[in-house]
Amino acid sequence: MHLSLLALFLFWISGCFTAQDPVTGPEEVSGYEQGSLTVWCRYGSWWKDYSKYWCRGPKRSSCEIRVETDASERLVKENHVSIRDDQTNFTFTVTMEDLRMSDAGIYWCGITKAGYDHMFKVHVSINPVPTTPTTTSTTTIFTVTTTVKETSTLSTQTSHYSDNRYDSGGVGDGNGFLDLSVLLPVISAALLLLLLVVSLIAWRMVRRQKKAAGPPSGQADSVTHILCPPKPHVQPLEDDLCYANLSLQQPRTSPLKKGSSMSSSGKDHQEEVEYVTMAPFPREEISYAALSLASLGQEPTYSNTACLVTHGPRTNLGEETTEYSSIRRPMP
């Protein structure tokens, strides 16, 4: 009977210590798939030299130990579960990494001792990976803010650039206008080309007017004498033709001597060549006619007829019949 009472007393003492210093911790923890979670379990100071463990199972008597300390503060890791005992703060920490959906269930914080171990039940739940994590949302907000700032900066730079362009030349490239440095050479080249064309047209008009007005007043018409051989007592045919070569020359003597002086200088400065068809008269035989056009205001030029072509000073042609003709330029 005394032994029974002693055993009952010892059991009561053991129960008092157990109720007084149990292992405590969170009743429920959760984590995200592919993430990690940490569980802190506290114990009494007199249990610091005992081994601590983390086990899984619905019943405390049949749970499976996943990781256990060696009664020291050294970190112990098994697979993706680790445990470390902090004997100064009387806590041991359990960390589960690379969580899977299959890791959800009932776990226990335990201390190994004689008899029944001290244990505390912890329910672990695993949540699927969120579609938009919190960190991603924060990053998105930051990116939007940065974009707004950059846009404002670009707008300011664009306005400043446009103002500079307006101040420098008044022509901006934003609206499709040409730069002033390109526009000025183009305008100058166009004006130069227009001036060249106008000058060419004016020169051609002046040249035509001079050509239509005839030779200058200081020039005279030279005469070339052509002889048609006389045919005595023979009626001239209709097809007997004589040609006269007329050329313009500078005068060298007075108007009265033009007939001889101009005939002797037939080789100087010929400008125009004209052919004149002359037919003999049926009434009387005229060998040739000499035509001399003088400038306005000058005396008429007289020319003699001869039977030979003469280009030098006139000579005595004998007793042949001589006829003179006076021709003046009509008044305009």
From Swiss-Prot:
Residues 251-270, 313-332 are annotated as: Disordered. InterPro entries: CD300_family_receptors, Ig-like_dom_sf, Ig-like_fold, Ig_sub, Ig_V-set. Residues 22-125 form the Ig-like V-type domain. Its main location: membrane. Residues 19-181 are extracellular. Phosphorylated on tyrosine. Disulfide bonds join 41-109, 55-63. The chain crosses the membrane at residues 182-202. Residues 203-332 are cytoplasmic. It is a single-pass type I membrane protein. The keyword Repeat does not apply. The record marks 243 as: Phosphatase-binding. Pfam families: SIT, V-set. Residues 1-18 form the signal peptide. One of its GO terms (molecular function) is phosphatidylserine binding. Belongs to the CD300 family. PANTHER family: CMRF35-LIKE MOLECULE 1, POLYMERIC-IMMUNOGLOBULIN RECEPTOR. Interacts with PTPN6/SHP-1 in a tyrosine phosphorylation dependent manner. Interacts with IL4R. This is CMRF35-like molecule 1. It comes from Rattus norvegicus (Rat).
